[in-house]
Amino acid sequence: MTCQTYNLFVLSVIMIYYGHTASSLNLVQLQDDIDKLKADFNSSHSDVADGGPIFIEKLKNWTGSNEKKIILSQIVSMYLEMFENTDQSKPHIKHISEELCTLRDSLSDGVKKVKDLMDLAKLQMTDLRIQRKAANELFIVLQKLVDPPSLKRKRNQPQRRCNC
């Protein structure tokens, strides 16, 4: 119950956050549907506050717009997974699920980035073959870390002309 209630709260935040960019979202209807969903899950139960929020704390660590899309894409996917195990015959659940699917589709780039991060986490850096590949790519990775704006500033500076 605790997870589900905080999930519902974060769902509200996601819907509102993307409601400003996705004009097709009817936030008033979604809020009403989410209230019905909270009632379905009995989110006023006393154990809801135990352990703190599930997603809200994670959202605080992702500050940039692109970063938020990455974490929100994962959270939206988790909500959709949660709704797979609920009664889809209820209109409010069906409506929320449909809106989440629309949001997930608009965040598909974030889903790919999450997959990339998970793939990186799975790499066995003790494997000699992986180490060889990593050594081969190290210079390119370091080039990506170099501050590109410093190079741009040099190009944009007016060239000094010789007054000979």
Swiss-Prot record:
Pfam families: IFN-gamma. Keywords: Antiviral defense, Cytokine, Glycoprotein, Growth regulation, Secreted, Signal. The lineage of its organism: Eukaryota, Metazoa, Chordata, Craniata, Vertebrata. This is Interferon gamma. GO terms for cellular component: extracellular space. Belongs to the type II (or gamma) interferon family. One of its GO terms (biological process) is adaptive immune response. It is found in: Secreted. Coiled coil: none annotated. Glycans are attached at residues 42, 61. Homodimer. Residues 1-19 form the signal peptide. It comes from the Eukaryota. Produced by lymphocytes activated by specific antigens or mitogens. IFN-gamma, in addition to having antiviral activity, has important immunoregulatory functions. It is a potent activator of macrophages, it has antiproliferative effects on transformed cells and it can potentiate the antiviral and antitumor effects of the type I interferons. InterPro entries: 4_helix_cytokine-like_core, Interferon_gamma. GO terms for molecular function: cytokine activity; type II interferon receptor binding.
